[in-house]
UniProtKB/Swiss-Prot annotation:
It comes from the Viruses. It comes from Rotavirus A (isolate RVA/Cow/Thailand/A5/1988/G8P6[1]) (RV-A). Belongs to the rotavirus VP7 family. Glycans are attached at residues 69, 238. This is Outer capsid glycoprotein VP7. Disulfide bonds join 82-135, 165-249, 191-244, 196-207. Residues 1-50 form the signal peptide. N-glycosylated. The N-terminus is blocked possibly by pyroglutamic acid. Some rotavirus strains are neuraminidase-sensitive and require sialic acid to attach to the cell surface. Some rotavirus strains are integrin-dependent. Some rotavirus strains depend on ganglioside for their entry into the host cell. Hsp70 also seems to be involved in the entry of some strains.
Length: 326
C-alpha cells in the first residue's frame, strides 16, 4: 500500500517538474520572440513613412477652423486682437506713447495688456498686395477715399471671404469661370489684365488671339484686381506677369474673424451686391471721421460689440500662404 502511495506521489512530483519546465520553456520562447519583435520595430521605424492623421490633414481650401459666433461675454481673455490702421493716423496723432494709451483703454474693456496689436499700413493699394491677418480677431480701419472706392471694395471682398486659389499658366492654357463664385484674383505692384473671349472653334470673339492689343482690358495698373467674366466661356488672358501674379480662385464663404471699419464717407461701401456674397454688413461698418483719436476712442468703446458679430478662428491669414494654396 505504501508502495502505491509513494508511486503516486512520485508521479505527481515528476508531472510538476515537467510542467514547470514546460512553462519556463514557453516563457523563454515568448521572451525571445517579443524582444526580437521589439528590436525589429526599433530598426525598421526610421525607414517607414507613416502618416499622422491628426496632423497631416487634407487641404479643404479653408485656412481656418469653423467656429460658431462668440456667445461668451469675455472671449478676449484668451484671444488676440489686431487693429490695422493707415500710417496717416500716427502722423496726425504725433505722440510716441499713443499706443500705450490705447493699450490702457483696451484694458478697461477687458482686453489684457499684450492681447491687442496695433499694425499700420501705408495705403489701401499697398495693403492689398500682402494682407496679413494673424490674430484671432482682426479689425481693419479703411479711411474713405472717393478715388479709391474700387480698391477698398476689392480689398474688403478679399479679406472678408475665404478663397481657394490655383496658379494659372496663361501662356499655355485658356481659362473659363465655371460659376459666380469663381473669380480671377491678381496681385502685384502693377496689374493690367486683358482678356479675349473665344468661340467653340477657339477663335477670338471681337479680338485676335495673336494680337493682345485687340484684347479687352478689364483692369489697368491695379495692385489688387478681382476679375469677373462671363461664365462658361473660354478666355485667352494677357497679364503683366513681370509685376503681377494671377490665380484662379473659388470663393468658399465668409472669413468671420475679420471686420472692416470704413472711416468717413457719406455711405458705407456695399460689397453684398455680388450675388455670391451673403449679406454681412455687420462686419462692414462705418464710423464718423473727425480726428483719428476720435476714431480710436470709438473703436475701443464698441470693440466688444464688434467682436460679437465675428467668429474666432484658430489660424491666421497670410496672403502668401493662402494665395498659393492648390
Amino acid at each position: 500500500m505504501y508502495g502505491i502511495e509513494y508511486t503516486t506521489t512520485l508521479i505527481f512530483l515528476i508531472l510538476f517538474v515537467l510542467l514547470n519546465y514546460i512553462l519556463k520553456s514557453i516563457t523563454r520562447v515568448m521572451d525571445y520572440i517579443l524582444y526580437r519583435f521589439l528590436l525589429f520595430i526599433v530598426i525598421v521605424t526610421p525607414f517607414v513613412n507613416s502618416q499622422n492623421y491628426g496632423i497631416n490633414l487634407p487641404i479643404t481650401g479653408s485656412m481656418d477652423t469653423n467656429y460658431q459666433n462668440v456667445s461668451t461675454s469675455k472671449p478676449f481673455l484668451t484671444s488676440t486682437l489686431c487693429l490695422y490702421y493707415p500710417t496717416e493716423a500716427e502722423t496726425e496723432i504725433a505722440d510716441s506713447s499713443w499706443k500705450d494709451t490705447l493699450s490702457q483703454l483696451f484694458l478697461t474693456k477687458g482686453w489684457p495688456t499684450g492681447s491687442v496689436y496695433l499694425k499700420s499700413y501705408t495705403d489701401i493699394a499697398t495693403f492689398s498686395i500682402n494682407p496679413q491677418l494673424y490674430c484671432d480677431y482682426n479689425i481693419v480701419l479703411m479711411k474713405y477715399n472717393a478715388n479709391a472706392e474700387l480698391d477698398m471694395s476689392e480689398l474688403a471682398a478679399l479679406i472678408l471671404n475665404e478663397w481657394l486659389c490655383n496658379p494659372m499658366d496663361i501662356t499655355l492654357y485658356y481659362y473659363q469661370q465655371t460659376d459666380e463664385a469663381n473669380k480671377w484674383i491678381s496681385m502685384g505692384d502693377s496689374c493690367t489684365i486683358k482678356v479675349c473671349p473665344l468661340n467653340t472653334q477657339t477663335l477670338g470673339i471681337g479680338c485676335l488671339t495673336t494680337d493682345t492689343t485687340t484684347f479687352e482690358e478689364v483692369a489697368t495698373a491695379e495692385k489688387l484686381a478681382i476679375t469677373d467674366v462671363v461664365d462658361g466661356v473660354n478666355y485667352k488672358i494677357n497679364v503683366t506677369t513681370a509685376t503681377c501674379t494671377i490665380r484662379n480662385c473659388k470663393k468658399l464663404g465668409p472669413r468671420e474673424n475679420v471686420a472692416v471699419i470704413q472711416v468717413g464717407g457719406s455711405n458705407i461701401l456695399d460689397i453684398t451686391a455680388d450675388p455670391t456674397t451673403a449679406p454681412q454688413t455687420e462686419r462692414m461698418m462705418r464710423v464718423n471721421w473727425k480726428k483719428w483719436w476720435q476714431v480710436f476712442y470709438t473703436i475701443v468703446d464698441y470693440v466688444n460689440q464688434i467682436i460679437q458679430a465675428m467668429s474666432k478662428r484658430s489660424r491666421s491669414l497670410d496672403s502668401a500662404a493662402f494665395y498659393y494654396r492648390i
